[in-house]
Structures are given as structure tokens and as C-alpha cells.
Amino acid sequence: NKIIAGLGVTTLIVAGTVSADTLTDVKEKGYLQCGVGQGLPGFSSPDESGHWQGIDVDVCRAVAAATLGDANKVKYTPLSAKERFTALQSGEIDILSRNTTETFPRDTALGLDFAGINYYDGQGFMVRKGLGISSAKELSGAAVCTNAGTTTEMNAADYFRSNGMDYKIVAFEKMDEVVVAYDAGRCDVFTTDRSGLAAQRSKLK
């Protein structure tokens, strides 16, 4: 498998800062409930012992250390792209620390505070070497696997439309479902952030 192209720049950020009310709740219960991704190596994934690790997890631990004086006072809630904002809005989690692109509509319409950007990335396409494709402009007619309801899905639609190419989207709520579908040959292309493609490639057969 190889990654062949990037689409613009996306940002991976921490969405939702600890407000005064949230901070009070966190201190009263004695731990931070932190929303993370569902297993993205390097960002948020459990090791063989079940301990979460990665950049996003480190942010959770840093917030716990700053608010509670103990980096270990964190409980992790794995969330899909579809679930992440609802979980934060409903109070199921105190903060969200996972790969999430900050956009103007999200910044203004969700009622959430976006913290500073901690990772810049670009979207890419991954295809099997056997297809002999070297450019994203050769993907006309391809079936494309991705996460449903994400900027990744919208960016792909914009890219194919602006280049006058047909394609079929094959979208799933959970990233593991995307990986399984791509591995099983249900689509020709896997698209997400380039860092995500590099991480998920390790799970392919």
C-alpha cells in the first residue's frame, strides 16, 4: 500500500477547553473524563496492558496534572468521529482530545471552545501498489473508503467534483470498519489524514 496524494491542510486539535463549571465538576469527582480516538497508533491507542498512550492521551494527562495535580487521574472514552461533539456537548466527557479538524462552522455553531492547534496534517489517499496508480487524478471511478460525517468525506467530494471525476464513497462510522473494508477489497482507495493512513497501514494484512 502507498500514500499518493494530499488534500490541503487539516488540523488536529483539542476541542473543548475546561470552563469554570467543567473545572468544578472535575475537581468534585476527582478525575478527568477525556474523549479520545478509537485506536490510532501514535495518537490514542491502548497498549497490550490496556494503558492508553499517544499524543492525544498525553494532552489528557497534562490537563489532569494541571487541574488535579495527578496525571493519572484520567478516564478515557473512545469516540468515533460521529460521537465526539455530542459527547462533549452532553457532558459525557469533560474535554475532547482526538484528531479533529477545526473549521469555521464547527468553531461558531457547536457551542464549544477549540484549544490551540497541536498538530498540522494533510489528507491523503492510500491505494494498493498493484493498481499502479501514482496520482490522485487517476482515481476516477474508484470506490473510496472513509469515515462518515467528517471533513475527510467532504474534502474527497470536493476533490473529485473539482477534477470532474466520478467516484463511489463507502463510508463507515468507525475507523476500524474502514480499515476492515479496505483490507477486504470493498474499496480501491482509503482516505483520511496522512498521519492516520501511516498509522492504520500497520493494521493491514
Q: Where would I find each of the regions flagged by the language model?
A:
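N-terminal hydrophobic or amphipathic helices and topogenic motifs
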Residues: 3-8, 18-75
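Gram-negative bacterial Sec-dependent N-terminal signal peptides
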Residues: 13-14
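Alpha-helix boundary recognition
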Residues: 27-28, 89, 137-140, 180-183, ...
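Alpha-to-beta junction loops
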Residues: 32-33, 69-72, 89-98, 142-143, ...
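Bilobed "Venus flytrap"/periplasmic-binding protein-like clamshell domains
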Residues: 33-42, 52-67, 101-102, 121-179, ...
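Acidic, polar ligand-binding/catalytic clefts
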Residues: 61, 65, 73-138
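A ligand-binding cleft/hinge motif common to bilobed small-molecule-binding domains
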Residues: 83, 99-109, 155-162, 181-205
